[in-house]
């Protein structure tokens, strides 16, 4: 089902995200920071992204604006996250900001169906990251959620045609 063409878009985005969370086989990816430390993040959704032939997927104004806002919010907190100094309250605030932007992206999406299908993977990882940053999984850290969001942002930059976006 297309997020962009459904009046229940936000609810469906959350349901799709929860389906990804419940998937029994989550791929384990290594996330390497420029500072040298590593941590594991579950990143099954964006691992499924593919290019549109040899080119990136189309974007619309709502998607570009929302992803820019998510990127800016994440980058503002990234130094504290990277240093291990992000507080639970800061993680909660960042998660709320990302969730608001994702809801807006989904509600206002006008992508062609194939691009929309690939966007589902980015949205799923963003929302799983939001859940983890809120402390939604006692076996995972809030930092794991931030790493998942970071991976989703990098994947968006790699697979979607957004000339202004720098991941």
Predicted regions and their residues:
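Bacterial N-terminal signal peptides
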Residues: 13-24
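Bacterial N-terminal signal peptides that target proteins for export
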Residues: 2-14
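Short, solvent-exposed, charged loop/turn and helix-capping segments
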Residues: 101-120
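Secondary-structure edge/capping motif, primarily at the C-terminal ends of alpha-helices
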Residues: 74-85, 105, 109, 130-140, ...
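Helix-rich interaction surfaces within compact, conserved domain-sized segments
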Residues: 119-167
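Amphipathic alpha-helix face/heptad-repeat signature
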Residues: 59-66, 70, 87, 91-94, ...
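Immediate post-signal-peptide N-terminus of mature secreted/exported proteins
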Residues: 29-86, 165
């Amino acid at each position: 089902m297309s997020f962009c063409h459904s009046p229940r878009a936000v609810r469906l985005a959350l349901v799709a995200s929860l389906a990804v969370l419940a998937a029994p086989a989550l791929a384990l990816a290594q996330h390497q920071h420029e500072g040298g430390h590593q941590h594991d993040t579950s990143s099954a959704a964006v691992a499924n992204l593919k290019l549109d032939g040899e080119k990136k997927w189309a974007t619309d104004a709502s998607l570009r604006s929302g992803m820019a806002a998510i990127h800016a919010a994440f980058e503002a907190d990234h130094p504290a996250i990277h240093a291990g100094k992000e507080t639970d309250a800061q993680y909660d605030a960042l998660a709320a900001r990302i969730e608001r932007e994702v809801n807006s992206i989904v509600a206002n999406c006008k992508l062609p169906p194939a691009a929309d299908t690939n966007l589902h993977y980015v949205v799923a990882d963003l929302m799983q990251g939001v859940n983890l940053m809120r402390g939604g999984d006692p076996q995972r850290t809030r930092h794991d959620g931030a790493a998942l969001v970071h991976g989703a942002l990098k994947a968006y930059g790699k697979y979607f045609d957004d000339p202004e976006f720098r991941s």
